[in-house]
């Protein structure tokens, strides 16, 4: 697979929901999704479009949906085939914190040189806690982060100081 500058990856609510019996609580009537939360946030598309229009290679991977549709999918092998400087994982809703953090652990073990970035509503609220996890390098805070994401990608590409990137927590 061609190398990407950024892969935006949507994890399932629980990793690995295919191997464990879990009792799921109710899902909002407003969000047409199963308890696996297979719908990625709309912001993935706006961030990807903005970065692509500025010359970056961006791919969206809906891992939750892929796993839901293929019970035999080998997640480790699939993730190993991906190649990106940065993997962005959404933590939009708190119920999918476990899945996002576990997939980030897998990515860290498979791609130790790549940066792991979290974003979304819950990431914003819990950025101080998230950044303490060893598998989390960066947290983009806020909504409508297309401009800060562009600044982040440019800073990483040019090995510049991250202090000038708005809305960013890092270690």
Report each predicted region and the residues it spans.
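A structural preference for long, well-packed, hydrophobic secondary-structure segments
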Residues: 32-50
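Short, basic and Ser/Thr-rich N-terminal targeting/leader segments
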Residues: 2, 38, 45, 162-164
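Nucleotide donor/acceptor-binding cores
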Residues: 2-4, 85
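Proline-rich low-complexity regions
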Residues: 11-12, 40-41, 127
């Amino acid at each position: 697979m061609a190398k990407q500058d950024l892969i935006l990856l949507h994890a399932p609510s629980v990793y690995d929901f295919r191997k464990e019996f879990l009792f799921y609580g109710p899902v909002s009537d407003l969000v047409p999704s199963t308890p696996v939360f297979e719908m990625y946030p709309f912001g993935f598309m706006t961030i990807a479009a903005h970065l692509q229009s500025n010359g970056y290679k961006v791919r969206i991977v809906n891992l939750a949906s892929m796993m839901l549709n293929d019970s035999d999918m080998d997640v480790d092998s699939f993730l190993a085939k991906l190649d990106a400087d940065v993997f962005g994982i959404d933590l939009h809703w708190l119920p999918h914190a476990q899945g996002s953090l576990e997939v980030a652990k897998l990515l860290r073990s498979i791609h130790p040189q790549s940066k792991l970035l979290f974003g979304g509503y819950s990431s914003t609220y819990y950025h101080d806690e998230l950044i303490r996890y060893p598998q989390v390098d960066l947290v983009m805070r806020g909504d409508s982060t297309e401009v800060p994401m562009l600044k982040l990608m440019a800073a990483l590409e040019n090995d510049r100081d991250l202090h000038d990137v708005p809305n960013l927590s890092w270690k």
